[in-house]
Every structure is written in C-alpha cells, then in structure tokens.
C-alpha cells in the first residue's frame, strides 16, 4: 500500500504536530511553530474553519498511524458499529494494529520503522511470523521478535535507548523482546495528540 512520501517536516508544521515522531520534526516545530508558506506566520484560520479543524484531526490520525483514506474510513466504520464511544473505539482499533504494537513495545523508534520491521517478517505473533502491519492483535496475544530481529543492532539499540516506557496494556518479558497484550487499551493509555470526537463529527456530517 502506498504511503506518504512528501516533505515530512512541512506536513508536521501544517498540522502543528510532529506526526512522524522524529527529532527533525520536533526541532522544526520549536523553531517555526506556524504553518509553512509565505504567510504562515500571520495566516489566520477562516471564521468558518470548524470543518477544517475536524479535517485536520482526521489527517493527524491518518498520518500518525500510517493509513490511507480508504483504510481509515473502513476502520472508522468498524468503530462506529461497536458499542461505546465511536471516537475511543477508533483509537483503540488503531492502537491494536501490529505495527503500532511494535512501536509501543519500544522495538522501533517510529511507527514507519515499526511498519518496516513487520513487513520484513521480523515479528511473530503467538509463535508464527506475521508480516501484515495492519493485522490486529487481541487480548492474550504474545508478540515477539524473530530470532533474526532479536540479534539486530538497531532493534537492541532501540530497546536500550528509547525514552518511553511500555504502555499499560502491554506486558514486557524476555528482556524486552516479548510483549503480551494484557487488555485492550483504554483512552487514558493512548497518548496521541488527536481529538477523536472531531473526527466523529466530521464523518457524521
């Protein structure tokens, strides 16, 4: 599936969020906390910008989790069929993607890197290799690094140096090279800068 390959810093500035979780994006937002372009510093959102604000929240969620529109819409429709708040359901389904679990486990420094690890067959679920980034894990699933991945310098470096602790719905084992899905993530365990209710309002129009 095609992914966004354009200027990442520019996109992060447009959405006012470091959506690709890299140091370059963080520095750019600190240095220029306004949209790109000739009039970015002084440009105001139009008075009728409710739709634009809602659209921006959807775009942020799409780019953070690496989905294209069709896949994102399909996930939203599934979330809407579930019991409970649709917005929270949406974020929960996105969090349970295998590539996101690899990122949350601390094996990858960014979600795009996590997606690459999964696509290259470096991840196992319940003892079997799974190379589909969008595959969804469930409570009780055990996600591990393949023997090859467990010996990769880049992954060991990430485990040793990344400054984020494993989220509450995952449990680490095997020196950080295995995680078990303890439960489905609650909203308070999801730290993405997305106002999910605005996405619900957008799709409800």
Residue ranges and their predicted role:
Residues 121-125, 129-131:
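Glycine- and Gly-Pro-enriched alpha-helical subdomains that act as flexible
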Residues 117-118, 137:
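Short, well-ordered loop/turn sites that connect or cap secondary structure elements
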Residues 108-111:
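Beta-rich strand-turn-strand
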Residues 1-105, 132-205:
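Ferredoxin-like alpha/beta domains used as RNA- or RNAP-binding modules
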Residues 113-115, 201:
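Short, hydrophobic/aromatic-rich beta-strand segments within well-structured domains
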């Amino acid at each position: 599936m095609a992914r966004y390959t354009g200027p990442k810093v520019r996109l992060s500035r447009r959405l006012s969020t470091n959506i690709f979780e890299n140091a370059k994006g963080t520095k750019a937002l600190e240095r220029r906390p306004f949209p790109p372009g000739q009039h970015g510093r002084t440009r105001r959102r139009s008075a009728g910008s409710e739709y634009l604000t809602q659209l921006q929240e959807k775009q942020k969620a799409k780019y953070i989790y690496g989905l294209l529109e069709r896949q994102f819409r399909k996930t939203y429709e599934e979330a809407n069929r579930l019991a409970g708040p649709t917005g929270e359901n949406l974020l929960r389904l996105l969090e349970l993607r295998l590539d996101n679990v690899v990122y949350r486990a601390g094996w990858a420094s960014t979600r795009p890197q996590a997606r690459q690890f999964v696509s290259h067959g470096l991840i196992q679920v319940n003892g079997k290799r799974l190379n589909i980034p969008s595959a969804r894990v469930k409570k009780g699933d055990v996600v591990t690094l393949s023997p090859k991945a467990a010996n990769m310098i880049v992954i060991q470096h990430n485990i040793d140096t990344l400054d984020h602790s494993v989220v509450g719905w995952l449990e680490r084992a095997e020196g950080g090279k295995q995680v078990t899905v303890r439960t489905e993530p609650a909203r308070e365990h999801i730290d993405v800068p997305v106002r999910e209710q605005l996405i619900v309002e957008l799709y409800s129009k």
